[in-house]
């Protein structure tokens, strides 16, 4: 019996580090980032992305005081701050490519990405201006395709090199998106994405070079 006890102790000792690693990696044990309760802003006036952002694929850099994305292939750069449930977001965005494709994610999990350039399913909402070779703009819930598209328009194209000012609010399930002060797309989610796993913002990219600046996030009034 003493032999069995010693063997059991050795097995337990060998398995303990792995068990601890699994537990610490689980959502329940993960340390939550700071919540935005006032006004958060980022003008990107620095040489590197910095600790407030999680680059999941290396497709992001700071150039000329702007956050530049290119060839990220749906590896978002997640802001390490938790969004207010009702939120107001403003930012400036520019595509340098005729393919347009300016996009951000809202209320995602803060870490997910596309591992194989396959069909990307977001953990939050996707707002895409000039996607699919500058042919379609959408608000998506999770999936960018098919049933995931909740509001769409195809009558406006991204002009390469032009800076667009985005204003986005979510109150309850209602998402309202304006560009340069004019209504662009809106949709009300009957089952809003809220709580754990749905608290973060990201900028995202496929191939186009896209630049972001003057990000401001605050609780919606």
Predicted features by range, described:
Residues 75-81, 152-157, 202:
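Beta-strand-rich interaction surfaces with strong enrichment in secreted/lumenal proteins
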Residues 44, 91, 160-188:
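Carbohydrate-binding surfaces in secreted/extracellular proteins
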Residues 188-213:
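Flexible glycan-contacting loops in extracellular carbohydrate-active proteins
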Residues 58-75:
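Short carbohydrate-recognition loop motifs
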Residues 27-29:
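N-terminal Sec signal peptide cleavage junction
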Residues 31-55:
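Extracellular carbohydrate-recognition regions
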Residues 143-165:
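Short, aromatic/His-centered strand-loop micro-motif at the edge of beta-sheets
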Residues 73-139:
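Secretory/extracellular carbohydrate-interaction modules
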């Amino acid at each position: 019996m003493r032999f069995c006890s010693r063997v059991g102790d050795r097995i337990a000792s060998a398995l303990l580090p792995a068990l601890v690693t699994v537990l610490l990696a689980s959502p329940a044990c993960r340390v939550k980032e700071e919540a935005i309760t006032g006004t958060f802003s980022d003008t990107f006036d620095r040489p590197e992305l910095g600790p407030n952002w999680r680059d999941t694929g290396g497709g992001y850099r700071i150039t000329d005081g702007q956050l530049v994305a290119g060839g990220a292939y749906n590896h978002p750069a997640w802001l390490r701050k938790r969004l207010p449930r009702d939120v107001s977001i403003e930012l400036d965005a520019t595509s340098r490519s005729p393919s347009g494709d300016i996009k951000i994610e809202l209320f995602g999990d803060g870490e997910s990405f596309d591992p194989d350039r396959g069909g990307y399913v977001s953990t939050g909402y996707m707002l895409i201006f000039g996607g699919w070779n500058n042919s379609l703009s959408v608000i998506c819930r999770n999936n960018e395709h098919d049933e995931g598209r909740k509001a769409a328009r195809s009558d406006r194209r991204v002009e390469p090199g032009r800076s667009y000012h985005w204003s986005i609010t979510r109150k309850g399930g209602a998402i309202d998106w304006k560009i340069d002060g004019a209504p662009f797309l809106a949709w009300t989610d009957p089952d809003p994405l809220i709580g754990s796993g749905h608290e973060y913002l990201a900028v995202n990219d496929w191939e186009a070079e896209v630049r972001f600046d003057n990000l401001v996030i605050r609780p919606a009034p």
